[in-house]
């Protein structure tokens, strides 16, 4: 038995938690460089504001209706997510963190001693008490059904109280008959068009299809979905995320970059961030790549995009080695006379241990005390905030930095941003 817990309008809700004056007002959160809408409060949805709407096109409309806009505050969202997940892990024996705002909980054994709907309400109340965030809880025998139950809990929140238990077969069939097939987890727009052409329009229709026919005309993934809709568990709980195969840190610039020095600072910053993520995965890498590109949509400007890579002889997780390699790659592909829109650094070819055959002629041979130094660097930045310690190559006035003109304070991670109660 699974429970899917999903925070309602997560990014927008994180902003209103610390701004009670915004409750009841439409709130939207914008993407990188304040580009387009990526999160909306319930009030913003009621105004018809769609996901992905460009901010510059809707700015006057937002002002007309009193819409409050925020730049993406990823540091705040990550910390609030961690608080939610920690609460869920205390209440459930096993938890799979599926995304920043949702997680699957294993309810095996709980049904024998607790009413599942009551337990779902307890989850909602506990998360609300600790974080002031509201979650929807969908309970069912499979992950796919739990997704549908969660969808119903959020869509009909007033009637359900934000908790839907689909362990009852009759209730399952009633809900499946109401859900369009394109809203089923794992069924995309392209597949739904094919299903509609076959007369399969609802989740109930899909659940009643022959698994053999579905596998023949589609694939084994959709067959698993059919079985899951019937209550046959095909997807297990994944408590530990699989090891990453690559790490990418890339950004679009707040302003176009035409100066090599500014680009080098950006590449140093992205390489340092990628190295920090690499150490967070307890991995070492050998492959390091740098990319740069101009905007393909810029009027009367030539397009240029390129990348270069190096492969180290000895795996590393030292930021200094990764920054050095990334800058060497930049030097290979940099061209004067262009206004660059985006750059990034990618790491690959991972090793779980920094052990490999050493080479006498390796310029990136392991540095003495490297692991200890990187450990101290990460600890200080985790304790006092990202960017407390940084490399000189990253620069101080970062004119290329991502534009975030409506950024809220990092209330939970920066002492300087703590709320003052008067």
PLM region spans:
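Short, charged/polar, Gly/Pro-enriched secondary-structure boundary elements
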Residues: 112-114, 299, 352-358
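Short, charged/polar surface micro-motifs in flexible loops or helix N-caps
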Residues: 10, 33-36, 295-298, 350-354
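Short Gly/Ser/Thr- and Asp/Glu-enriched loop/turn motifs at secondary-structure junctions
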Residues: 98-102, 140-143, 283-287, 338-342
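C-terminal hydrophobic structural anchor segments
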Residues: 327-383, 387
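DNA-contacting surface of Y-family translesion DNA polymerases
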Residues: 183, 191-339, 355
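Gly/Gly-Pro- and Ser/Thr-rich, intrinsically disordered tail segments characteristic of DNA damage-repair
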Residues: 1-227, 236-237, 367-422
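Short, hydrophobic beta-strand segments
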Residues: 103-109, 307-313, 356-362
């Amino acid at each position: 038995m699974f429970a899917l817990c999903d925070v309602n309008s997560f990014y927008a809700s994180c902003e209103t938690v610390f701004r009670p004056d915004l409750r009841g007002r439409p709130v939207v959160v914008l993407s990188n460089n304040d580009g387009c809408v990526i999160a909306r409060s319930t009030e913003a949805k009621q105004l018809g504001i769609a996901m992905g709407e460009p901010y510059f096109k809707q700015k006057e409309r937002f002002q007309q209706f009193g819409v409050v806009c925020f730049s993406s505050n990823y540091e705040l969202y990550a910390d609030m997510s961690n608080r939610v997940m920690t609460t869920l892990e205390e209440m459930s024996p096993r938890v799979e963190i599926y995304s920043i705002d949702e997680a699957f909980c294993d309810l095996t054994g709980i049904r024998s001693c607790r009413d599942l709907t009551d337990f779902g309400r307890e989850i909602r109340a506990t998360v609300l008490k600790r974080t002031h965030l509201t979650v929807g809880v969908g309970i069912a025998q499979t992950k796919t059904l739990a997704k549908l139950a969660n969808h119903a809990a959020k869509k009909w929140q007033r009637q359900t109280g934000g908790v839907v238990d689909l362990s009852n077969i009759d209730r399952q069939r009633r809900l499946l008959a109401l859900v369009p097939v394109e809203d089923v987890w794992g069924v995309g727009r392209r597949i739904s068009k094919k299903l509609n052409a076959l007369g399969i329009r609802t989740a109930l229709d899909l659940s009643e299809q022959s698994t053999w026919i579905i596998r023949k005309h589609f694939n084994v993934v959709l067959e698993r979905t059919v079985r899951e809709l019937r209550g046959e568990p095909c997807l297990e709980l994944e408590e530990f995320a699989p090891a990453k195969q690559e790490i990418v840190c890339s950004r679009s610039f707040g302003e176009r970059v035409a100066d090599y020095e500014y680009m080098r600072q950006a590449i140093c910053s992205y390489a340092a961030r990628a190295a920090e993520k690499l150490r967070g995965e307890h991995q070492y890498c050998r492959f390091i790549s740098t990319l740069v590109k101009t905007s393909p949509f810029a009027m009367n400007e030539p397009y240029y995009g390129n990348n270069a890579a190096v492969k180290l002889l000895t795996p590393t997780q030292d930021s200094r080695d990764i920054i050095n390699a990334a800058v060497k790659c930049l030097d290979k592909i940099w061209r004067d006379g262009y206004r660059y829109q985006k750059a990034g650094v990618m790491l690959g070819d991972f090793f779980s241990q920094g052990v490999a055959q050493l080479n006498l002629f390796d310029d990136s041979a392991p540095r003495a005390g490297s692991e200890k130094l990187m450990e101290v660097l990460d600890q200080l930045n985790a304790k006092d905030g990202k960017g407390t310690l940084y490399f000189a190559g990253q620069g101080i006035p970062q004119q290329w930095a991502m534009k975030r003109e409506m950024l809220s304070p990092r209330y939970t991670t920066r002492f300087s941003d703590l709320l003052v109660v008067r």
